[in-house]
């Protein structure tokens, strides 16, 4: 069951140890999800757009073949590494701002956890969907499953400069940014 975290934004969590959080933005009868989980969660619909923050199985295994638009950073689709599961219907994310209803989504390439990790900023709500790059409490994603420690440090530096209000990571708690 999705839990509201904003006017048009909800999240679905299952077993966070093995399944990434699924985020949903709904507007005008359209649905966009960020990450699809590990396939155990029943979302009950085919989203109009699915954006994957990276290619690890706990964020991609929920993608179904009939989903019309699945986007993944181009570097991720080309990389073959541990724990990656790239859906067959994933297309390269052009990494250009995406307008979804009244939401403007901006993409940031944040390698470190994986080569093609991204964060997504919803300019309307101030929500930063950080995948497994940054977590509440200052935590960050592991770099031993196809990542790179130096790139992670650079990505965390980039995130610290992004003007967001709410951090929504791929696992664990969401966190309001202190002003």
Language model segments and positions:
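Active-site neighborhood of phospho(di)ester-bond hydrolases with catalytic His/Asp-centered motifs
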Residues: 33-37, 47-58, 70-74, 109-112, ...
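Active-site HxH/HxHxD metal-binding segment of metal-dependent hydrolases
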Residues: 15, 37-100
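Short, flexible loop segments at the rims of nucleotide/cofactor-binding pockets, characterized by
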Residues: 8-15, 31-34, 49-52, 105-111, ...
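Conserved beta-strand hairpin/beta-sheet module of binuclear metal-dependent hydrolase folds
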Residues: 1-43, 119-136
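Short glycine/proline-enriched coil/turn segments at helix->beta-strand junctions
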Residues: 28-30, 43-49, 64-69, 123-126, ...
